[in-house]
Amino acid sequence: DQEEPIILKDFNRGAAYSGPLVILVNKYSASASELFTNVMKDYNRGVIVGSTTYGKSTMQVVLPVNEDEPKDGFMKLTTGAFYNIYGKSHNEKGITPDVELPDGTNTTAHAPSFTQPFEVPDVQAASRIPVNAPLGLDNIISSSTKRTMNNDVFKKMNLQREKFDQLFHKSFDLTLENVFKHYQEITSLISELEISYTDALFTVEDHESTTEILKYNSIDQEYNEEIKLQLSSDPYVQESIHILTNFNN
């Protein structure tokens, strides 16, 4: 039998951060990150940027088929689902961002192929939940679209995505030679889609607490520099900064 919905309340009143917020997501965002994103979107708390998320809002538990014989295997049972304040689940559908960005991985080759996804029915919406006023993102979306249309990296992603879709649906005789050739074509396209983390687009600085911690570990210092380089040369992060700046103004 279906149990009554349980409303999860915030036992820590107040906010740790109340400033402008941008959340980057894509189809690999699932589970906890989707729950957080969904809440932020429902409450109009921040701008969701990127591409539609995976779409998982269910909870599972793994149990042995036979507790006395572990070798008999295990089974995974779905025991519950998460809903937003309006009584709807993002399971299977995912969360659509407020501002969509080109995604080189968002191809039909990566599209979900589940023929019988787990259907989560709606439940009664929560009552008397105060939310922030709509953010009013029309100008932000328009400005972002213009920037991405003129961005060489994003333009290349759109072109390569079309090529990848064509290659994925290509038919060929199943021979070892053809399979190897097809594999080489795919890996070649994937390498072209990869972002070159070499040219910094902006400056990334460490927080004072991070600087203090890094004093005592040279390996972490090197790793930290690599992370900063990747962030400073990532076009998605750069566009998110533009959006955050527009949103703040």
Which residues does each PLM region occupy?
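C-terminal "post-core" interaction segments
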Residues: 1-249
